[in-house]
């Protein structure tokens, strides 16, 4: 194991670095649509795997974009990643896509980071705080498949709705904007 970076720092750097790489390949405009999404999935997966091979060679690895290696089940430490959550959103130039990186030790999540690269943000388990913003008081729902009942529920609760793409973007939306104040206990 490389002692150059703590697990927390490595988790955060992987989420940030993956996001920067993905923004870079999208920004040059050589690929579009499905080809861009597939290239993004592949490149992000390969880069994360290589970084973990170098810095945490004895750890297990589980990724949405790679074949499962059952050997991870024998490991005390397992990295769980979704290198590009929201491939369709990424490929079409939307901002609601994410990079997920987590370390689980002996079955317990110990470090996690969710990068929202187009928003210039990495949410880290090492840095929890209350945030408010333009989506406060809104229910996050699927941009692609919003439930028919969502508007009714939002109206009954006196809330609005916010259609969001990737699961990571929805999760961060919930963490950031469901609590109107720190005293509500969600992010205190």
Model-derived regions: residue spans:
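N-terminal subdomain of lithium-sensitive/metallo-dependent phosphomonoesterases centered on the IMPase/IPPase/PAP
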Residues: 1-84, 152-155
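Residue-level signal for inorganic ion chemistry
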Residues: 22, 52, 87, 116, ...
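DPxDG-like acidic metal-binding loop motif
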Residues: 72-126
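A short secondary-structure junction signal
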Residues: 124-126, 149-154
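Short loop->beta-strand "edge-of-pocket" segments that line small-molecule binding or catalytic clefts
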Residues: 130-148, 156-165
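Short helices/loops that flank or line small-molecule/ion binding pockets
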Residues: 169-176
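Conserved small/polar residues in nucleotide/adenosyl-binding loops
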Residues: 177-182
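N-terminal low-complexity segments that are often proline-rich with Ser/Thr-Pro
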Residues: 185-188
